[in-house]
Every structure is written in C-alpha cells, then in structure tokens.
Amino acid sequence: MTQTAGTVLLETQILQNMGRADDAARVMRAGVKVFDTDPILRASLARLYISQDKFDDALEQYAILIAQDAENWEAVYAKALVHLEIEEYGEAESLFQRLIDSGERVDESRYYLATSFERQGQLERAIDNYRLVSIGTNNFLGAQQQATRLSIALGAVDAAHDWLQRVSRGQPRLEVLFINMEAQLLQQAGLPAKAKQLLDRSLNRYPGEVDLLFARVIYFDSIKDLAGSEADLRSIIAIKPDDARALNHLGYMLADQTTRYEEALTLLESAIALNPGDPATTDSLAWAQYKLGRYEDALQNIRRAFAVFPDPEVASHMGEILWMMGRRDEALAVWQRALEGAPDDPLVTEAMQRLQTQASEDESE
C-alpha cells in the first residue's frame, strides 16, 4: 500500500489504541520527515507529545507549523496553551495577545490570558480579562465565576455584585444563575451573612425561585439551622412536588438530625421512586432504614449505593450499619479502605471513634 499522510495517521491511531504510544510516536516522527509540510500530521505529532508530557517536543512541532504558516491560528493557540501548562507565562501571554489582536479565538484567549495573570498573582488584570469574555461563549460562565471569586477575595464585594447585575440585566434566568453563584462564592469566602442577605433580597424579587431557595437551604445547613432548611425545602416541594433533590435532602436531614424517621422514610421513598438508582438517594434511604432498625434492608441499599459511588460518607454509613449488625470486622475493613483513599476523612473517623468508644464503655460496665 502506498504510504500517505493519511495512512501514517491511521497506523499511529491503531498503535495508540493498542497502548503502544512509543511506537506510535516513532511512526509519526518518520511520517513527518516524509510529509514535512502536512500540517495535520505535524499537529497530530505535537498532540501525541503532549499526551506523553513531552512539552518541549510539542513546542518544537508547533513552532515549525507557525514558521510554515504564520496564520496557522490553531497552532498558535495550541502553542500558547502548552506554554501556559508549563508555566512559561510570558510566551503564553504573547501568543494569546497575538490571537486577540488578529481576531482569532478571542474569547478563549481572553480566558486563558486571565488565567495566566491569576496564576502569577496579578488579580486585577485577571479580573479585567475574565470580564472581557463574551456572553454566550463556552468560557463565559467560568470567566464570570473566576472574576467574581477574585473580586470577593480582594474585598470588592459590592463591585462584584454590581458587575454581575449589569451583565445579566434583562435576562432573569442568567441573573438567578449569577445570584446563586455569588451566594456560593460569598459562603466559600467566609461571608455567610452577606450570602444570606443577597438570597433574602433576591427571593423578595423572585419569590418561589427554586434554585434560590435551595441556595438558602445550603446557607441554613452551614449554620445548622434545621428549621430554616426545612422551611425552604418544604417550600420547594410545595412548588415542585417531584423535586427529587429536595425530597432527598429533607428526608436525609430528618433521618440524620431528628428522630422523625418514619417521615424521613416516606420522603426518601418518594425521592427514590422519582430517581431510581441514584446512589445519593439510595444512601439516604438506607440511612433512614438503619435508624428505624431495618438493618437488612439498610445494608442491601447501602451496598447498592457504595457499588456505584464509593464515597467516604457512604463508607461511613455502611461501616456503621455493619457494626450495629455485629459484623465489626467487616465494618473496620470498610472504614480502613475508605481511609486509604481519603486519610483522616472526618465522617469515617467520627463513626469509627464513636462506635469503638461506645463499645469500650459497654464492655466496661
């Protein structure tokens, strides 16, 4: 068969699929020597080098592509991303700016130019560039989130809010999305009171807006205000009786933090009927069954949840259920495996310490 750039690419792809990356690179390098001016083949070699963390080799290939065609904007963009990846910020910024000046990949370049500034601690320049990313583009929401987070970190909370309001004016769905995002960022920044004020004001403007109610539930959860969380969750369920997320959240909260276990079970059975197979809801259902003393049912469901989502919280629950069934060696094995993946996880360590302490006290009586 006559060799072409296409056959080189095909052979390389086959070798990669077989896990023979080094052989694929060898074939590709040989092909590039033969088909020196084929941009697709050389760009493929550069991407192969990137997959092998051979960034200098990738940069060399992109440099050749740009030398062959100064307006190969995909090569310019890819080269800029590699420089950013290996923290060669000056080179990356120069190339991103070149793309912007040429009207090519402008919004992506703005986003990554801002990322470069952020990584170097030039936060105000980062904010300015994040805010220049155009609405409706792939990076728009991420850019606004980063700009808002950095503004809050700099203490410019009101300015961040005003910017989001200005950008979303006349677009209620976008405004609600931004309010939710801003509230989360305020909480993460240690400003829960401001988050609560924002949500209260916004719910006065958009009463019954489910996403904002749920955001306020997260606030109430953070300050352990059970009554506040329950009130907003019940408001959500009244508006959307089939909201499995709210049913699960309320059911788990009642099972975990109250003795209203039957009520919790009813809510969780409704949630699982709406969202069968969801591991988080299955875990919650198992927890309510455990609290009601239905250990076998609880174990069956917790195993099902853990098989799909082996999260430390699910592991802590499964261990506790096994422990209370008298299967302590199995419980310890579950906890130990969880701690191997998440050392010192507070949920797992709390369950272990609480139950082991209780067992020691029972034995000493």
How does the language model describe each region?
Residues L10, S44, A78, Y112, ...:
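Canonical tetratricopeptide repeat
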Residues M1-T2, V34-F35, Q68-D69, D101-G103, ...:
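Structural marker of alpha-solenoid helical repeat scaffolds
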Residues Q13, R47, L81, T115, ...:
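Residue-level recognition of tetratricopeptide repeat
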